[in-house]
Swiss-Prot record:
InterPro entries: ATP_synth_OSCP/delta_N_sf, ATPase_OSCP/d_CS, ATPase_OSCP/dsu. This is ATP synthase subunit delta. It is found in: Cell membrane. F-type ATPases have 2 components, F(1) - the catalytic core - and F(0) - the membrane proton channel. F(1) has five subunits: alpha(3), beta(3), gamma(1), delta(1), epsilon(1). F(0) has three main subunits: a(1), b(2) and c(10-14). The alpha and beta chains form an alternating ring which encloses part of the gamma chain. F(1) is attached to F(0) by a central stalk formed by the gamma and epsilon chains, while a peripheral stalk is formed by the delta and b chains. One of its GO terms (cellular component) is plasma membrane. Keywords: ATP synthesis, Cell membrane, CF(1), Hydrogen ion transport, Ion transport, Membrane, Transport. Gene3D superfamilies: N-terminal domain of the delta subunit of the F1F0-ATP synthase. Belongs to the ATPase delta chain family. Pfam families: OSCP. It is a peripheral membrane protein.
Amino acid sequence: MSNKAVANRYAVALFELAEEKGQTDVFERELELVQEVFETTPQLETVLAQPGLAADKKQALLRDAFQAHLSPAVMNTINLLMERGRYSEIVGLAGEYKQLNDDKKGIAEATVFSVKALSDSEKNQIAAVFAPKAGKRELRVVNVVDSALIGGLKVRVGDRVFDGSIQGQLKRLEKQLVAGQ
């Protein structure tokens, strides 16, 4: 089973529990904290990967680091991953959980490629226009500057791409011209 599939299984189980308790956003914030610690402290994963360190010591390390900041359900999920030797799935669990919570709320992330950095106002306008097209209530816009676009925008929401860039228009024109010969 792939790492993403494993992380997703745990995320689904934790999300269902969070829904029952009415704490989906609380659990998301807690998992974001865990993810941030793992991403900013690469030594933590190195220590957890040590085969010579007993599993109970690894669990104790995480319990000492997180127990004061996490609800019992989130802490138990992390302990379960540790017991099963799946410490590397903890960060993936956080990402999968966030995706589930966003889907439930009708929120998606949009990557907007543009020639120049977009202002907050422009990001808000893009979110307002593309959220209904993507079937979402709200979009979080992440701007990526790409000078190869020449002009215009390219918006990616999940697997869908809306290409209004000059580069994209030139490519489509080229295909039409080649097909017409």
